[in-house]
């Protein structure tokens, strides 16, 4: 698991240079769901996060903290797994096709 899609792309390149095949030898998952992830071969499995909602909640929290520094809150936002082809399936099924990965994005 990589903390960003960009790092995942770099990891895939590094694994390839060492002769490892993704997903046959090693699985890779990114985080961010950047547009480039859909154009890789295989498509990158990634976690999508609601950037707009995170920005809105951040502004709300900062505004409240300016008025009352003790007004703290933990905010949990939903995330979603976007299945690509960089994770080896343990159940024997084939990884999603480019079309099915695009439909789920």
Task: Give the role of each language-model region.
Residues 1-98:
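Flexible loop/turn connectors
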């Amino acid at each position: 698991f990589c903390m960003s899609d960009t790092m995942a792309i770099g990891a895939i390149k590094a694994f390839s240079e060492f002769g490892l095949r993704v997903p046959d030898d090693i699985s890779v998952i990114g985080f961010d769901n950047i547009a480039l992830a859909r154009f890789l071969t295989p498509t990158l499995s990634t976690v999508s996060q609601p950037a707009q909602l995170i920005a809105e909640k951040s502004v709300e929290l900062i505004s409240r903290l300016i008025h009352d520094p003790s007004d703290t809150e933990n905010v949990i936002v939903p995330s979603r797994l976007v299945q690509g082809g960089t994770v080896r399936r343990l159940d024997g099924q084939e990884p999603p096709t480019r079309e099915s990965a695009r439909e789920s994005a």
